[in-house]
Structures are given as structure tokens and as C-alpha cells.
Design a protein with these regions (language model features):
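Alpha-helical segment proximal to the catalytic Tyr-Lys
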Residues: 125, 169-170, 241
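Catalytic loop of short-chain dehydrogenase/reductase
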Residues: 136-159, 164-173, 185-186
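Short, small/polar-rich loop/turn modules that mediate ligand/substrate recognition or access, typified
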Residues: 172, 177, 243-245
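Conserved glycine-rich Rossmann-like NAD(P)H-binding loop of the short-chain dehydrogenase/reductase
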Residues: 32-47
Length: 259
């Protein structure tokens, strides 16, 4: 399917690896030029060069911590016209409710709520002026079904979801859509960290931890970044203009919900 976005430019945050990279790869395959962002310059440039070689699109890299105001300014100062924004940032660490203090919550809110809001506020007005734009926020399945050990993530990402619910409906009339992708477990570094936490808590092997988690997923496996990226690219496409303020679960059926 031709997504109808060839020649547009996307800013994909936290895209040197994992789900962000999956989104960048899928958009590049659709002919979209990229501005890729991540904290580590070396890994970021390596990922960008692979995409340049594979897809022949223009790829600019900006190494900065998007969770900070300084990082956001660095990224925004380094971009031109942005048609597509993919908000992404690493999730806060797992733990128990009594482990977290105020600073832990502030860090989680900065990375997973306030940073994407800042990027939306900075880039969406110009999209509205042009009459077209796409914003996709990578959140978590925990927005729909909170996960006990991910209380920091539950809190911050749910806050972003509430913001998007209202904002998306205010900008849709100008041709701009804002939607959220809610990943369940995917084969990423984040999954490794979560499984590693299970290993420590229960004194089992990493293989057993992964097998137990996979057994709770109707699909029987972890998702891939390529599957996730394909969903992201569709939400950014010309075909998704009537999808507004939605939360799309990509979890292999793990979250048993009908609405």
C-alpha cells in the first residue's frame, strides 16, 4: 500500500534503537525523510546511516536528551519543516509503590508526559497552518491496563493520554491528527530490563522469565520493532486522516479488553 507520504519529513524521537527505530525505518521505507534523535550520538548515527543506505532518504541526526528542556531546544533549533512527529522516550524503571519519591515522579513526568507535550506545542501550530500533520505518541499498554511494578510509567503516560484526548479533537479540523500507540512487550532493551527485574526478584533464569511472559500473550511471543513501525507508519499516512485521539494497543492480545 502506498502510504501517500513520500517526500514528507518526520521527526522521530529516541530512534536509535527499539520501537523508535522501528518507526523511523518504516517511515523511511514509505519515502519519508527523517530527523532522528537520541542521546547517544554514535548509535544514532549508525542507525541513520543504515537507513540512508537501505532507503535512500535524507536523514539528519540530532543527539540530545529529549526529556530535558535543553534537549528539546537543541532538536527544535536543528529542524526545518516537520510534517510528522513521533514522540518517544525510554520508560522509567520498574519498582514498588513505596520505592519512589517526588524526584522519581518528576523525572517520569518530564520524559513521558511533559516532553511530548512540549514537542506537540512547538510543532503542531505550523502543521495546522499548512493544513496537514501527524503526531504519534508511543505510550504503553499500561495506559489501558496498569502494571503494578510500572507505577511511574502508568502515571506519566496516563497523563499524556488525557492531554491528547482533548488536544487531538481541537486540532483535527485543521488536518492534524494525534494518536497514541500502546505497546505491550516487544523484543527491545526495555523488555530485557523488565525480564531482568523478574530474574532478580524470583531467582529464575532469563530464558524462564521470557518463556513465562510469552505464555501470557495469546500470540505466544514478543512483538517486533518492524511490526510496531508498520502500525506507526500507517497512523502517519494519508489513509489515517479520520483516526483522531485513539489509543492503539499492540500487545499480541495480552490486554483482554473489548473497548
Amino acid at each position: 500500500m502506498d502510504l501517500g507520504i513520500k517526500g514528507k519529513t518526520a521527526l522521530v524521537c529516541a530512534s536509535s534503537k527499539g520501537l523508535g527505530l522501528g518507526c523511523a525505518e518504516a517511515l523511511a521505507e514509505a519515502g519519508v525523510n527523517l530527523v532522528m534523535n537520541a542521546r547517544g550520538a554514535e548509535a544514532l548515527e549508525a542507525a541513520a546511516e543504515r537507513i540512508r543506505q537501505d532507503q535512500g532518504v535524507e536523514v539528519t541526526t540530532i543527539a540530545a536528551d529529549i526529556a530535558t528542556e535543553a534537549g528539546q531546544k537543541a532538536v527544535l533549533n536543528g529542524v526545518g519543516q516537520i510534517d510528522i512527529l513521533v514522540n518517544n522516550a525510554g520508560g522509567p524503571p520498574p519498582g514498588m509503590w513505596h520505592d519512589w519519591d517526588r524526584e522519581d515522579f518528576i523525572k517520569a513526568l518530564d520524559a513521558n508526559m511533559l516532553a511530548p507535550i512540549a514537542m506537540i506545542k512547538a510543532l503542531v501550530p505550523a502543521m495546522m497552518d499548512r493544513g496537514w500533520g501527524r503526531v504519534v505518541n508511543i505510550t504503553s499498554q499500561s495506559v489501558r491496563a496498569p502494571i503494578g511494578v510500572l507505577g511511574l510509567s502508568n502515571s506519566a503516560r496516563t497523563g499524556l493520554t488525557g492531554y491528547v484526548a482533548g488536544t487531538s479533537r481541537q486540532v483535527a479540523g485543521k488536518g492534524v491528527t494525534i494518536n497514541n500507540l500502546l505497546p505491550g512487550i516487544h523484543a527491545t532493551d526495555r523488555a530485557d530490563a523488565l525480564d531482568g527485574n523478574v530474574v532478580k526478584q524470583r531467582n529464575i533464569s532469563l530464558e524462564d522469565a521470557r518463556a513465562e511472559r510469552a505464555a501470557t500473550i495469546p500470540a505466544g511471543r514478543y512483538g517486533t520493532r518492524h511490526e510496531f513501525g508498520a502500525a506507526c507508519a500507517f497512523l502517519c499516512s494519508q489513509h489515517a486522516g479520520f483516526i483522531v485521539g485513539q489509543n492503539l494497543l499492540l500487545d499480541g492480545g495480552a490486554t483482554n479488553l473489548t473497548m
